[in-house]
Amino acid sequence: MRVGVLGAKGKVGATMVRAVAAADDLTLSAELDAGDPLSLLTDGNTEVVIDFTHPDVVMGNLEFLIDNGIHAVVGTTGFTAERFQQVESWLVAKPNTSVLIAPNFAIGAVLSMHFAKQAARFFDSAEVIELHHPHKAEAPSGTAARTAKLIAEARKGLPPNPDATSTSLPGARGADVDGIPVHAVRLAGLVAHQEVLFGTEGEILTIRHDSLDRTSFVPGVLLAVRRIAERPGLTVGLEPLLDLH
């Protein structure tokens, strides 16, 4: 399988270049960064592209890839409901093309989101804290936002988080994602970390995941690359490939 990497000079992208080059069953067909023409992908007969670029350019990348029938595995963040709808509209004309967009490719992070969804309905309170390096473009992270949405979905019909706060400084209680407070930390020395806190009378459950190195994303990305053709259309999250429902 011929695989191209977009964002090849970034920290995650460079990790993916090395991973693809080291895989016996994959061929690195192109490695592109800012300013490189996307036509290099078609020139290299690329079948699947790994995109770890920037929210400002990822939609243009996807439009090109879909138009050319190239499958896409996307770790770039910043996707909204409107962006997902746009991707789906492009895919209508290319029913055999696959796009997988995931907020996190670390297997442990995907499992932690799944565990949080399972635990959510058993506790009165839930909050999310995400911690990342200071170069991250958005806050909260895509993983934290998705985690909060999964928790809110699992708690549908239950009372809201108890919170007697009547006055606070702006942002002190975090961002509100579907009723779940999400707090973002940006600190030198961090890579990617998340804590999900659940509380009820007499006990607290903490689900924590730490990516200590960007190689933690490699197994999930390569799994998606190898299996993406099995899922035409848009897939959001790595969960379907791990049989997590």
Curated annotation (Swiss-Prot):
Residues that coordinate or bind NAD(+): G7, A8, K9, G10, K11, V12, G75, T76, T77, A102, P103, N104, F105
Active site feature: H132 (proton donor/acceptor), K136 (proton donor)
Catalytic activity: (S)-2,3,4,5-tetrahydrodipicolinate + NAD(+) + H2O = (2S,4S)-4-hydroxy-2,3,4,5-tetrahydrodipicolinate + NADH + H(+); (S)-2,3,4,5-tetrahydrodipicolinate + NADP(+) + H2O = (2S,4S)-4-hydroxy-2,3,4,5-tetrahydrodipicolinate + NADPH + H(+)
Keyword list, A-Z: Amino-acid biosynthesis, Cytoplasm, Diaminopimelate biosynthesis, Lysine biosynthesis, NAD, NADP, Oxidoreductase
Biological processes, Gene Ontology terms: diaminopimelate biosynthetic process; lysine biosynthetic process via diaminopimelate
Pathway(s) served: Amino-acid biosynthesis; L-lysine biosynthesis via DAP pathway; (S)-tetrahydrodipicolinate from L-aspartate: step 4/4
Binding site for (S)-2,3,4,5-tetrahydrodipicolinate: H133, G142, T143
MF-aspect GO terms: 4-hydroxy-tetrahydrodipicolinate reductase; NAD binding; NADP binding; oxidoreductase activity, acting on CH or CH2 groups, NAD or NADP as acceptor
Gene3D superfamilies, sorted: Dihydrodipicolinate Reductase, domain 2, NAD(P)-binding Rossmann-like Domain
Enzyme class, first EC level, given as a word: oxidoreductase
Annotated EC: 1.17.1.8
One of the Pfam families matching this protein, by short name: DapB_C
GO cellular component, as recorded: cytosol
Cellular localization per UniProt: Cytoplasm
InterPro entries found in the cross-reference section: DapB_C, DapB_N, DapB_N_CS, DHDPR_bac, NAD(P)-bd_dom_sf
Function recorded in the entry: Catalyzes the conversion of 4-hydroxy-tetrahydrodipicolinate (HTPA) to tetrahydrodipicolinate.
Family from the record: Belongs to the DapB family.
Protein name: 4-hydroxy-tetrahydrodipicolinate reductase
